[in-house]
């Protein structure tokens, strides 16, 4: 019998290493199982078997696997194939992919390998609601309903909804209603259960059974029905389809219909969203459709919850539906039939640090083409790369260009901030046109959203006499001023210090806030509209999940009149009461040193505009800018996506940017500016020798060139059409390997980012 060897993925930044399989383990070592192996001087590591073969490794001394620590596979063959592709495409190691894919309690190490060995995980059950035993008479129910008014209107409304859906002729006999069919929130239903007005029971039902009931019973508009049929037709010719639907067009209803069809076939569905903030509203809608069989997977779950989810999914044969953020693409979903990537244009789908620096969207496309699933990419403002792939026939393309129901696209107005300032028609960073719209909306009981893409009170403070401004001692960037707490803070490294009341440089004047952030807008709006209830949603608020949920819930329930926020409020929320949206400074969106700046400006403006005028009101959006003649801002105001794309494709083809070329960046970091400069120049020269001088830039500082006392330089490699990406990547790897062996520069950190944002 030939000797057997196994390639082992270790939780290190290494390629898989080969070990011999001893005779005693030959029948128990399987692909995907966990094993202990010796490495280095007396060290033992736990890894995952990725391949078993008979080819002798090119090592002088071949070590044997010590033991099998987990016979149940931690990774399926499909997962291992995905890990290999991610490692190859994004120029990292399978060990780094494994560390990202496995929950912490399953990551191979001596302490945790038996933790969940005997756990049994049940499939989801359907939660059923019925009238509480104590109120099953007209008199008792009537008294209970009267007691809810006037203070608990949400509970009263939920009870009326329950009685209406069950039917007055059946409600007193204890007839049941699936909880998912209730429009009321889970919190309201829990209160009713606690009060004895409702009671719950569990009924075991598969997600496939629930999905089968949905088919043909989902209410779609004529435009949605046409789009759904077109998507199905496109899937006969393409594995990936781009759904280009305007804001408010009801893309979620299409996703639910597609998911129901897939689940009814016993196949699994993965629904990806870019931000945690999006999941709350979406989960409510999906639970109403698919019941408690829905799985939610985000980075904010506990380690145990993530581990339980991972094992349950790995043991399932299919018929699962999971909604999650970027990391959910690495879950072990067996018999995967459909991947939905909502807001596919969003930069959050790309992981920047640490490795693997992968795109969940592009990984979903690979899964569609290699693992037999279908992928739908949805957006009101598709990325130019995705649109180009649809335009050239690589993806299918479906257009949904009218809003669902009676909702109309909002009217958009561009307001010139310079002209308003000259006329004295500007107060608290709000032009008269926007102030008038806010006042009218509040008078009608409508809500307002105000977008300013800077957090804090002001971007920086400056001395009016000598020009001093506070800068981070570790990063060199200006410190953001926060009025609450009177502090200056670096939004890169977190450094914080008290705001000075006297200039530290000239010792004369008091530094003054310059510019404005969300904190200042919140204060100014509260002063301008003293009777309005104002809240803020930005990165500072989002640091607390509970606080963020409270802000969103308050606005959703009409308890907040004006919501001030950053990019977070552009993320696909569906707030019915919003009739006015204000963009306070569109200029700072354009001021980014990035070839995607205009595309992202357009996307942000269209997305935030789309928050206005849902359901039965048209809505108004005011875009404030000092550049009212800027093409991108005009195109966004008109919602003219195709004009923006035409302009951008023309420019990118001329200058060699995606989708007409691929980009790889190599980032170098060191605590010495001189050392990182020396090393970066040396590496750039070598890359130019290997790849060609036209394809490699000189070393240059990125937009943020120092963080936490570490200096940063970048080299960009451009891969033109017709050039093999794999060959260029091999040459980059060769240069990086040589660089790492050089004793002079080897302490310089290097990272590779394929297809950077």
Please place each PLM-identified region on the residue numbering.
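C-terminal structured "cap/appendage" subdomains that terminate the fold
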Residues: 683-723, 728-735
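A general secondary-structure junction signal
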Residues: 51-53, 102, 202-204, 452-454, ...
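A short catalytic or substrate-binding loop motif that flags glycine-/basic-rich loops and adjacent residues
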Residues: 41, 455, 709
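A general secondary-structure signal for short beta-strands and their flanking turns/coil
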Residues: 3, 14, 618, 659-663, ...
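Accessory, non-ATPase domains that flank or precede helicase/AAA+ motor cores in DNA-metabolism machines
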Residues: 1-379, 391-407, 690, 716, ...
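Short secondary-structure junctions
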Residues: 529-532, 687-696, 741-747
């Amino acid at each position: 019998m030939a000797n057997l060897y196994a390639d082992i993925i270790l939780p290190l930044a290494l390629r898989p290493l080969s070990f011999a399989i001893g005779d005693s383990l030959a029948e128990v070592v399987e692909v995907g199982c966990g094993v202990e192996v010796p490495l280095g001087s007396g060290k033992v590591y736990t890894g995952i078997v990725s391949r078993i073969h008979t080819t002798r490794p090119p090592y002088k001394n071949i070590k044997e696997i010590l033991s099998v620590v987990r016979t149940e596979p931690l990774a399926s063959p499909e997962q291992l194939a995905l890990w290999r592709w991610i490692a190859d495409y994004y120029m990292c190691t399978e060990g780094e992919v494994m560390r990202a894919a496995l929950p912490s309690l399953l990551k191979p190490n001596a302490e945790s390998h038996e933790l969940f060995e005997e756990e049994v995980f049940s499939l989801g059950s359907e939660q059923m609601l019925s009238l509480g035993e104590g109120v099953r008479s007209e008199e008792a129910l009537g008294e209970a309903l009267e007691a809810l008014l006037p203070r608990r209107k949400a509970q009263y409304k939920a009870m009326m909804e329950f009685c209406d859906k069950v039917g007055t002729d059946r409600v007193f006999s204890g007839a049941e209603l699936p909880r998912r069919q209730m429009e009321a929130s889970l919190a309201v239903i829990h209160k009713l259960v606690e009060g004895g007005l409702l009671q719950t029971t569990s009924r075991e039902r598969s997600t496939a059974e629930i999905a089968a009931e949905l088919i043909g019973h989902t209410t779609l508009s004529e435009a949605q029905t046409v789009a759904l049929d077109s998507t199905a037709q496109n899937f006969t010719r393409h594995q990936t389809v781009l759904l280009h639907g305007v804001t408010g067009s009801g893309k979620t209803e299409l996703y639910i219909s597609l998911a129901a069809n897939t689940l009814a076939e016993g196949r699994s569905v993965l629904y990806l969203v870019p931000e945690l903030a999006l999941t709350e509203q979406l989960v409510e809608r999906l639970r109403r459709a698919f019941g408690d069989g829905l799985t939610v997977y985000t980075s904010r779950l506990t380690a145990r919850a993530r581990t339980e989810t991972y094992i349950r999914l790995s043991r399932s044969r299919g018929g699962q539906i999971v909604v999650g953020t970027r990391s959910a693409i690495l879950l072990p979903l067996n018999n995967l039939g459909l991947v939905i990537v909502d807001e596919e244009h969003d930069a959050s789908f790309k992981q920047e640090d640490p490795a693997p620096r992968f795109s969940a969207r592009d990984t979903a496309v690979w899964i569609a083409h290699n693992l037999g699933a279908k992928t739908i990419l949805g957006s009101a403002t598709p990325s130019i790369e995705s649109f180009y792939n649809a335009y050239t026939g690589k993806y299918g393309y479906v257009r949904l260009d009218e809003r669902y129901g009676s909702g109309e696209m909002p009217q958009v107005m561009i307001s010139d901030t310079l002209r308003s300032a000259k006329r004295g028609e500007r107060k608290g960073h709000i032009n008269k046109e926007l102030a008038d719209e806010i006042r009218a909306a509040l008078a009608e009981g409508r809500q307002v959203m105000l977008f300013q893409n800077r957090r804090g009170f002001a971007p920086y403070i400056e001395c009016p006499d000598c020009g001093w401004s506070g800068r981070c001692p570790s990063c060199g960037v200006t410190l953001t001023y926060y009025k609450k707490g009177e502090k200056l803070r670096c939004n890169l490294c977190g450094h914080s210090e008290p705001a000075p009341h006297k200039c530290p440089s000239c010792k004369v004047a008091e530094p003054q806030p310059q510019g404005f952030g969300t904190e200042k807008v919140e204060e100014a709006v509260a002063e301008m509209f003293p009777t309005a209830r104002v809240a803020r949603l930005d990165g500072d608020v989002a640091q607390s999940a509970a606080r963020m949920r409270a802000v969103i819930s308050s606005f959703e329930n009409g308890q907040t009149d004006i919501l001030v926020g950053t990019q977070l409020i552009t993320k696909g929320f569906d707030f019915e009461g919003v009739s006015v949206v204000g963009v306070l400074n569109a200029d700072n969106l354009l001021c980014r040193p990035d070839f995607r700046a205009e595309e992202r400006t357009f996307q942000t403006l269209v997305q935030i505009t789309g928050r206005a005028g849902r359901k039965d009101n048209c809505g108004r959006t005011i875009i404030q800018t000092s550049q009212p003649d800027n093409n991108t801002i005009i195109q966004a105001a008109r919602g003219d996506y195709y004009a923006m794309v035409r302009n951008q494709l023309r420019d990118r083809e001329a200058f060699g940017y995606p989708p007409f070329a691929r980009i790889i960046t190599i980032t170098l970091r060191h605590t010495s500016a001189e050392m990182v400069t020396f090393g970066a120049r040396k590496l750039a020269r070598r890359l130019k020798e290997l790849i060609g001088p036209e394809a490699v830039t000189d070393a240059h500082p990125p937009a943020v060139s120092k963080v936490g006392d570490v200096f940063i330089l970048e080299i960009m490699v451009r891969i033109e059409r017709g050039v093999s990406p794999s060959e260029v990547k091999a040459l980059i790897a060769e240069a990086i390997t040589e660089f790492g062996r050089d004793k002079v520069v080897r302490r310089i950190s290097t990272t590779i980012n394929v297809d950077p944002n």
